[in-house]
Amino acid sequence: MSPASGDVIGRLVILKAWESCEKEIMGKFLRETSFLDAYDFSFIPVGYNLGFEHNFLKRRAEVHGLPDIDILSKPFIDLRVIGILMKGGEFKGSGLNKITGKERDGMMVPVWNKVGDYDKIVEYVEMEAREFVRFNVWLYSRFPSLFIEWKKTWDY
């Protein structure tokens, strides 16, 4: 993500479990990113509801005997809180599929995986990434003016 615009700066890479094995894919992620660097800001996860990814990656790394993948122990940006605030503080209805053009949630992904409908999984991941980036860019373009407006209300 571009720190200036929130837009993508590279191409989407989908690590496909059906082309390899989970342990190999997770190892590739650890090797090809700066996630394990000692410097906390080398890899900053940005997403929506990162708790889901955190729990999954942490548990699967443990199962495979890989280094700890704890995406919430270093700096991260989770836009879920913005969705909750935009829904008036309500968690219900604040999913990415409820506040963007994302057509559905990920409930069908395990089913598609089980029956080998991998094209639908790729389409889903691409749609989710596209809608996340669109939302992120929109927020980046509007939040600076909110900060200026907020500063004008300071009494000190």
Q: Where do the PLM segments sit?
A:
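Metal-dependent phosphoesterase core characteristic of DEDDh/y 3'-5' exonuclease domains
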Residues: 6-11, 39-156
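Conserved RNase H-like, two-metal-ion catalytic cores of nucleic-acid enzymes
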Residues: 1-36
